[in-house]
UniProtKB/Swiss-Prot annotation:
Native species: Thermosipho africanus (strain TCF52B)
Keywords tagged on the record: Cytoplasm, Isomerase, Porphyrin biosynthesis, Pyridoxal phosphate
Gene3D superfamilies listed in its UniProt record: Aspartate Aminotransferase, domain 1, Type I PLP-dependent aspartate aminotransferase-like (Major domain)
Protein name as catalogued: Glutamate-1-semialdehyde 2,1-aminomutase
Enzyme Commission identifier(s): 5.4.3.8
Pathway per the UniProt entry: Porphyrin-containing compound metabolism; protoporphyrin-IX biosynthesis; 5-aminolevulinate from L-glutamyl-tRNA(Glu): step 2/2
Catalytic class of the enzyme: isomerase
Pfam families assigned to the protein according to its UniProt record, in alphabetical order: Aminotran_3
Family: Belongs to the class-III pyridoxal-phosphate-dependent aminotransferase family. HemL subfamily.
Catalytic activity entry: (S)-4-amino-5-oxopentanoate = 5-aminolevulinate
Domain of life assignment: Bacteria
Classification via SUPFAM superfamilies: PLP-dependent transferases
Listed InterPro entries: 4pyrrol_synth_GluAld_NH2Trfase, Aminotrans_3, Aminotrans_3_PPA_site, PyrdxlP-dep_Trfase, PyrdxlP-dep_Trfase_major, PyrdxlP-dep_Trfase_small
Residues modified as N6-(pyridoxal phosphate)lysine: K259
Length: 423
């Protein structure tokens, strides 16, 4: 199938990481997926820790979500006009994401970030933006500068086709290094429109913010009249129902969302303070539009997902317990090796490294060759990790202790083979 795919699609895929190139393998083609498992076209079953790159916090094909999609499909798949689900989704986002007073729906995280930055520039009447090494904010030109995720593996610090003129307005600081931010503001502060950051980096693997880092960003941006943008495409409704901002109690001016709020369908959103959001067309001068923005199928799935979370007061604590169980199992299995695990709730990464991994530099200096061997070993035994050492693992509410135990068993088998020099 891959050979056929390569005839019609660049590299045979629609997103680079799916090619499995980083682990020196060919991709699988999925036939179906349910709960924590997926089945490929050869009828091989896998326990899936990709979960659509974090979009499926309830797992694949959750019965209630699927039913909502079916019901909405009977009523129409797209209107290109206003409908009640848009209002309900906006209400839920404003209810749960502390810094958001108004929100605009779009179709992807990339689109949300593009729009948020345009809005920040309009609000501040400034041009420069600050991003961080290893943080990925989609594939828009101005942000493909030392980007994380797929660009860590396949790109150079700036992708071909991105001109120097476009990226000349993008300043790059070091994640978890507040002094590097202060240096940029000392030099360019009066011209910086915004700082955009993943509050928990999730696209160079999971890298948690050091104590005081997010607070420092909030303080500096306020001092200079710049806006702080949290890219919560991954962390929104993942680390808590209030996102990372609620978890860390640091509140940005603008938030971008995606993944979970679409219930597994294409989605994006950006929101913030009312005075900022009212600059968006048709109320204000900042133009942004989309034929499929606020798509009813997507919003039906997303609303149902959020309501399922709302109705279970123990939802996140149960996910955290599973995440902790998985983390402890990996530590036990790989205890004879230099491995560092970064986890927050139901997203985690492990790095083969002698030092704590809290920066882009330490991420890229970890041993990716061991990860490739681990990926292949687990893959052969029906365990699907992300096909890149620079991506996060995601646990859904459909994963079970039995799933975790089976996975840890094969971690142990790999550890034994590695010690014996058999991989």
């Amino acid at each position: 199938m891959f050979e056929i795919a390569k005839k019609y699609m660049p590299g045979g895929v629609n997103s680079p990481v799916r090619a499995f190139k980083s682990v020196e393998m060919e991709p699988i083609f999925v036939k179906s997926a349910k709960k924590s498992k997926l089945i490929d076209i050869n009828n091989k079953e896998y326990i899936d820790y990709i979960q659509s790159w974090g979009a499926l916090i309830l797992g694949h094909a959750h019965e209630e979500v699927v039913e909502e999609i079916k019901k909405q499909a009977e009523l129409g798949t797209s209107y290109g006009l206003c409908h009640e689900l848009e209002v309900e989704m906006a209400r839920l986002i404003v209810k749960h994401i502390p810094s958001v007073e108004m929100v605009r729906m779009v179709n992807s995280g990339t689109e949300a970030v593009m729009s948020a930055i345009r809005l920040a520039r309009a609000y501040t009447n400034r041009e420069l933006i600050v991003k961080f090494e290893g943080c990925y904010h989609g594939h828009s030109d101005g942000l493909l500068v030392k980007a994380g995720s797929g660009a860590l593996t396949f790109g150079t610090p700036s992708s071909k086709g991105v001109t120097e003129k476009i990226v000349s307005n993008t300043l790059v600081a070091r994640y978890n290094d507040i002094e590097s931010v202060k240096e940029l503001f000392d030099k360019y502060g009066e011209n910086i429109a915004c700082v955009i950051v993943e509050p928990v980096a999730g696209n160079m693997g999971v890298v948690l913010p050091k104590q005081g880092f997010l607070e420092g960003l909030r303080e500096i941006t306020k001092e200079y009249g710049s806006l702080l943008i949290f890219d919560e495409v991954i962390t929104g409704f993942r680390v808590s129902i209030n996102g990372a901002q609620g978890y860390y109690n640091v509140f940005p001016d603008i938030t971008t969302l995606g993944k979970i709020i679409g219930g597994g369908l294409p989605v994006g959103a950006y929101g913030g303070r009312k005075e900022i959001m009212e600059l968006i067309s048709p109320q204000g001068p900042v133009y942004q539009a989309g034929t499929l923005s606020g798509n009813p199928l997507t919003l039906a799935a997303g609303i149902k997902t959020i309501k399922i979370i709302e109705n279970d007061p123990d939802f996140y604590s149960k996910l955290d317990e599973l995440g902790k169980y998985f983390e402890e199992g990996i530590v036990s299995a790989l205890g004879d090796f230099d491995v560092k695990i970064n986890r927050i709730k139901s997203m985690l990464s492990f790095f083969f490294s002698k030092q704590e991994v809290d920066s882009y530099e330490k991420v890229i200096n970890s041993d990716v060759e061991i990860y490739k061997k681990l990926f292949k070993c687990l893959f052969e035994n029906g365990i699907l990790l992300p096909p890149s050492p620079f991506e996060s693992l995601f646990i859904s509410s459909s994963h079970t202790k039995e799933d975790i135990e089976k996975t840890v068993y094969y971690f142990e088998k790999f550890s034994k083979k590695l010690k014996e020099g058999k991989v």
